[in-house]
């Protein structure tokens, strides 16, 4: 990108304006700058910056399978959007209940603990089939049950290790696109439209 920008600037007979430099740094039309894709078969999440893979994380989706029915405890599939990030600044393992910190810190792999911890990404469905995602309280969130990552173990949400969701939330902004695909993670050129 820098070489293209440098070449573009060199070809100009005038000094580039700040607006011209900003527009040269924008992604191609229709490519979301931040994107999260979750491959349920592999129990992995890949984050993309302008269709370029940035990082992969282990996740855990629902132990009850995939679907969009209220009360099913299924992980919804399809396109969604991050609406809000909750918990910035909380220490790893900080328990959240009703999207509010409780003051309790749950240790990693604490026996019998199945809490929402560290950060919560509130999602809304962007398709007819998953439009109820927000009303179903389906989130991407931290889990103390890190020993269950890479296997379906959640009650519908997408779980991550506390250190991973902290890192994700440092990069991700509201408005980022999230795709949950039932199969394997697609290559970048085959991402859902």
What residues fall within each predicted segment?
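Sec-dependent N-terminal signal peptides
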Residues: 1-6
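A structural motif detector for short, solvent-exposed N-terminal "entry" segments of globular domains
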Residues: 23-66
């Amino acid at each position: 990108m820098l070489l293209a920008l440098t070449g573009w600037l060199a070809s100009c007979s005038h000094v580039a304006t700040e607006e011209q430099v900003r527009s040269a740094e924008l992604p191609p039309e229709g490519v979301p700058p931040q994107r999260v894709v979750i491959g349920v078969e592999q129990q992995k999440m890949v984050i993309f910056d302008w269709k370029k893979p940035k990082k992969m994380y282990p996740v855990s989706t629902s132990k009850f399978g995939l679907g969009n029915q209220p009360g099913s405890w299924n992980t919804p599939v399809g396109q969604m959007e991050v609406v809000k990030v909750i918990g910035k600044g909380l220490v790893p393992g900080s328990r959240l209940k009703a999207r509010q910190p409780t003051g309790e810190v749950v240790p990693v792999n604490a026996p019998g603990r199945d809490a929402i911890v560290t950060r919560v990404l509130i999602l809304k469905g962007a398709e007819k089939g998953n439009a109820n995602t927000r009303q179903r309280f389906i989130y991407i969130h931290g889990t103390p049950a890190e020993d269950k990552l890479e296997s379906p173990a959640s009650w519908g949400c997408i779980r991550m290790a506390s250190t991973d969701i902290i890192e994700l939330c440092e990069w991700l902004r509201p408005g980022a696109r999230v795709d949950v695909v039932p199969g394997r993670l697609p290559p970048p050129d085959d991402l859902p439209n």
